[in-house]
């Protein structure tokens, strides 16, 4: 991936979130079948301006919530890719695209990234515009992204992190050095925590 632009890079974005003029935005539900927008979401325009090619929409959980999407895990078709940005993570894991867009209110970027074995990045609140994006929670919704490497993801973040007057939650932040920041290592010593949820007693041994 070139350092200064996204020229001719293929991208996918999840059907649930990103409004587009040239493709339907159905939010993973039949009640919005064929629904299209009169203008692109802000992040789509930023991608186009950077030279990216948006290849298509990926499957998502219905209304970006709990129901499973049509997508399966590319490493094991019998398993889930995680949600709600399931298709976005799976498309990167299956080499359909080098980078992909996702959204997160709870764990909808970091979960499918973990399940599919790709890099998931959920920037801090207010760094990326949600203008033209399906809202689940105004105070919790984030735009995130998926990539194959830690080095690739900041190149996309650098393009999308912009102040947008149509999303009052966004703030000005210079992302010029974001790639260098990823090379510095963690600010604190990482800790690994293993937590048994209430579902632990019913999970199968293979899982």
Regions found by a protein language model. Give the residues of each.
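Gly/Ser-rich catalytic/binding loops embedded in alpha/beta enzyme cores
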Residues: 1-106
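Short beta-strand-to-turn element immediately C-terminal to the catalytic PLP-Schiff-base lysine
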Residues: 2, 92-93, 111, 120-122, ...
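Flexible loop/turn segments at secondary-structure boundaries
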Residues: 20, 62-64, 107-110, 142, ...
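Short acidic, glycine/serine/threonine-rich loops at helix termini
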Residues: 23-25, 65-68, 110-115, 132-133, ...
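Short Gly/Pro-enriched turn/cap motifs at secondary-structure boundaries
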Residues: 35-36, 78-82, 110, 134-136, ...
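Predominant activation on well-ordered alpha-helical scaffold segments within soluble catalytic domains
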Residues: 48, 89-93, 116, 122, ...
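Glycine/threonine-rich beta-strand-loop-alpha-helix active-site module
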Residues: 105-131
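A short helix-breaking turn/cap at a secondary-structure junction
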Residues: 122-206
């Amino acid at each position: 991936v070139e350092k200064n632009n996204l020229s001719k890079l293929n991208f996918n974005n999840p059907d649930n979130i990103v409004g587009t003029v040239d493709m339907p935005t159905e939010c993973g539900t039949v009640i919005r079948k064929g629904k299209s927008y009169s203008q692109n979401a802000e992040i789509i325009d930023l991608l186009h301006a950077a030279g990216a090619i948006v290849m298509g929409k990926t499957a998502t959980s219905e209304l970006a919530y709990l129901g499973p999407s049509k997508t399966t895990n590319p490493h094991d078709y019998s398993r889930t890719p995680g949600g709600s940005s399931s298709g976005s993570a799976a498309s990167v894991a299956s080499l359909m695209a080098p980078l992909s867009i996702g959204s997160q209110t709870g764990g909808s970027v970091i979960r499918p990234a973990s399940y599919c074995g790709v890099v998931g990045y959920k920037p801090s609140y207010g760094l990326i515009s949600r203008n033209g994006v399906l809202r689940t929670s105004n105070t919790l919704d984030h735009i995130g992204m998926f990539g194959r490497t830690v080095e690739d993801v900041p190149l996309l973040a650098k393009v999308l992190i912009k102040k947008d007057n149509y999303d009052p939650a966004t703030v000005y932040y210079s992302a010029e050095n974001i790639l260098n920041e990823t090379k510095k290592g963690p600010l604190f010593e990482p800790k690994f925590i293993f937590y048994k949820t209430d579902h632990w007693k019913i999970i199968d041994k293979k899982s």
